[in-house]
Amino acid sequence: MSTPPAKRQKRDQYRKRAAAAANEDTGKVKLPQKKFYRQRAHANPFSDHQLDYPLSPAHMDWSSHYPAFVNPDPEQKNLAGARKLLKDVEVVDIGCGFGGLLVGLAPLLPETLMLGMEIRTQVIEYVENRIQALRTQQNQLKNSSTTASESPAPAIPAEPATDGASPDAASTPETSNSPVPGGYQNISALRSNTMKFFPNFFGKQQLSKIFICFPDPHFKAKKHKARIISENLNAEYAYALKPGGLLYTITDVEEYHHWVLRHFREEGEHEASEGGVKDLFERVSEEELASDPCVEVMRESTEEGKKVTRNKGNKYVAVFRRKADPEWPA
């Protein structure tokens, strides 16, 4: 009697089958299960990971990420010789985790290209398979509605609830039997180290929204340098954001929330010096946030957000608007 395969081998076999099934337009497509993509919560951003990144934003090949938005003119190519898109990526989820925010925002902003960036290998593999499965499901629904409109569309199995999630957590719009605006063609994800290579992907004033949801708090003082909010990184975010663009942050750690406010010069005894981050961002009022649908998605659609809700924890939100660049003195 042969011994059962090890857990790692089971996970590898499942991921290969899931990736292959997600690319097939026949048969029922199931969403990948997170339990087969588990990875430790931390990844050292200062390590030399084997990462692919473009020489500059003008060299980035987005055609494989957003095939539905590729420019039909084959002569339109970037500096790397790749096909250009009809529009630029405008929304970025830094540290996208398992992709809950992207999936939640996709039908809300169907004509806006959104990208998730994640450093963990198995997690980004899950997000890629999840998006591909969602696209295939939507294509099947679209095809079935046009070719056999008189018969009901086949039911699409819901993603099993994991990590103790309630049954309601699985019945999200992504498991709906009806078409979703955009068909999830406007979202994608890639593996990257934002702390090192963020400017390689996005040009000046390209983005309209940046999301930083439940980032690793790095509690130890010697680890604070690895936090994704800092003076230097805030300057890079400001470079990529359009004037009027928004940077969204949410955390369940109160100390980290105050860290965010301090590093945007919204709290503490820091003197606001000329040319500092205070000249680049202003905090958005609670009244404005109440009418922003993206805030509700950020609170409730991410996996971490759902976990905090189940545990009855607190969520601390701070959103900052990119100011227009000051005029040069005459």
Curated annotation (Swiss-Prot):
S-adenosyl-L-methionine binds at G95, E118, I119, N193, T194, C213, T302, E303, E304. Its EC number is 2.1.1.33. PROSITE patterns: SAM_MT_TRMB (PS51625). GO terms for cellular component: nucleus; tRNA methyltransferase complex. Residues 144-162 have a biased composition (Low complexity). Keywords: Methyltransferase, Nucleus, RNA-binding, S-adenosyl-L-methionine, Transferase, tRNA processing, tRNA-binding. InterPro entries: SAM-dependent_MTases_sf, Trm8_euk, tRNA_(Gua-N-7)_MeTrfase_Trmb. One of its GO terms (molecular function) is tRNA binding. Residues 1-27, 138-185 are annotated as: Disordered. It catalyses: guanosine(46) in tRNA + S-adenosyl-L-methionine = N(7)-methylguanosine(46) in tRNA + S-adenosyl-L-homocysteine. Residues 7-18 have a biased composition (Basic residues). Residues 172-185 have a biased composition (Polar residues). Pathway: tRNA modification; N(7)-methylguanine-tRNA biosynthesis. Belongs to the class I-like SAM-binding methyltransferase superfamily. TrmB family. Catalyzes the formation of N(7)-methylguanine at position 46 (m7G46) in tRNA. PANTHER family: 3-DEOXY-D-MANNO-OCTULOSONIC-ACID TRANSFERASE/TRNA GUANINE-N 7 - -METHYLTRANSFERASE, TRNA (GUANINE-N(7)-)-METHYLTRANSFERASE. Forms a complex with trm82. This is tRNA (guanine-N(7)-)-methyltransferase. The gene is trm8.
